[in-house]
């Protein structure tokens, strides 16, 4: 039997910390720091000029002058000005903030209705959507229940659309986690093909009670196989948000999933910034 739960109270999210990498990206936003070839962002160092193309080079003059001075030798006639050569040229190494693609993969199975887990999970998703709006992220929304996952929203900048899908999302049926992960990975791969500068974040909200899988496979091994494929790809930062209530009997399946994804695993309450509440006016402005 399906049931539509209300959305729980939203809250301010703690910053999501991503591992730094050396990939140079373009884009705008307010979440993740990334290396960039654009002449924007803060200077964090310098590099020797690659090739001999000076026309569009973002020259770091201070580092260039230091390199020329270190190479310079005082002649017999005394001090002379250093001569800058091509080998002295240094370019700026810059970092800037960009938005991310945040893929929400939400467990909407019947077990999420127990202890009003779905109400709390919806509140967490709304909080994360509000944070995504402020950070200028794109979002995608997948729900898994019954026998398979359903893509409720392809990547978009419209948080309002995601909110509507969240509000209407029913709960019921089995937990096809493997299907949810496979659809998430498909969306991420497609977006990376369209825009290689995308930096994806996968947020899986589940109690981990997996009990449905493709024909011929056991549920948890199928889910772990899908999780390991995402981890092996290496381009996605994943979090498994455990909706099981701490202090109750726990099955620790979410922990097993997080290990397969090589993901962090916060409980919902651990996402909350201390002492920060969301007021109704802020919510109305966003939605």
State the predicted function of each range.
Residues 209-260:
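VWA/integrin I-like adhesion module and closely mimicked acidic/polar interface patches used
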Residues 1-99:
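Acidic/polar low-complexity segments with low predicted structural confidence
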Residues 65, 95-155, 171, 178-183, ...:
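Von Willebrand factor
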Residues 257-287:
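C-terminal helix of von Willebrand factor
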Residues 130-134, 193, 228-236:
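Arginine/glycine-rich "motif VI" loop of SF2 helicases in the C-terminal RecA-like domain
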Residues 38-53, 106-111, 147-150, 164-167:
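Short hinge/gating elements
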Residues 138-168, 187-193, 217-218, 247-259, ...:
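Short beta-strand-loop
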Residues 140, 237-240, 264-269:
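Short hydrophobic alpha-helical runs that function as membrane-insertion/retention elements
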């Amino acid at each position: 039997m399906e049931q539509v739960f209300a959305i729980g109270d939203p809250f301010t999210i703690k910053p999501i910390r991503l591992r730094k990498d050396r990939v140079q990206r373009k884009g705008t936003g307010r979440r993740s720091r990334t290396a960039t070839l654009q002449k924007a962002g803060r200077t964090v160092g310098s590099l020797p000029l690659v090739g001999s193309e000076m026309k569009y080079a973002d020259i770091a003059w201070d580092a260039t002058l230091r390199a020329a001075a270190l190479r310079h030798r005082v002649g017999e006639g005394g001090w002379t000005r250093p001569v800058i050569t091509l080998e002295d040229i240094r370019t700026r190494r810059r970092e800037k903030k960009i938005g991310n693609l945040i893929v929400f993969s939400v467990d909407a199975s019947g077990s999420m209705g127990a202890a009003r887990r779905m109400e709390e999970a919806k509140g967490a998703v709304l909080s994360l959507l509000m944070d995504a709006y402020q950070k200028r992220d794109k979002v995608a929304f997948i729900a898994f229940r019954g026998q398979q996952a359903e893509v409720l929203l392809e990547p978009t900048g419209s948080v309002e659309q995601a909110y509507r899908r969240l509000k209407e999302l029913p709960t019921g049926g089995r937990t096809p986690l493997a299907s949810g992960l496979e659809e998430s990975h498909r969306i991420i791969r497609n977006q990376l093909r369209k825009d290689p500068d995308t930096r994806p974040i996968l947020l899986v909200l589940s109690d981990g009670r997996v009990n449905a899988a493709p024909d011929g496979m056991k549920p948890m091994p199928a889910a772990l196989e899908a999780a390991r494929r995402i981890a092996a790809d290496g381009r996605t930062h994943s979090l498994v948000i455990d909706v099981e209530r701490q202090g109750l009997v726990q099955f620790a399946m979410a922990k097993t999933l997080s290990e397969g994804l090589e993901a962090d695993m916060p409980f919902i309450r651990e996402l909350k910034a201390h002492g920060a509440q969301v007021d109704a006016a802020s919510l109305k402005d966003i939605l």
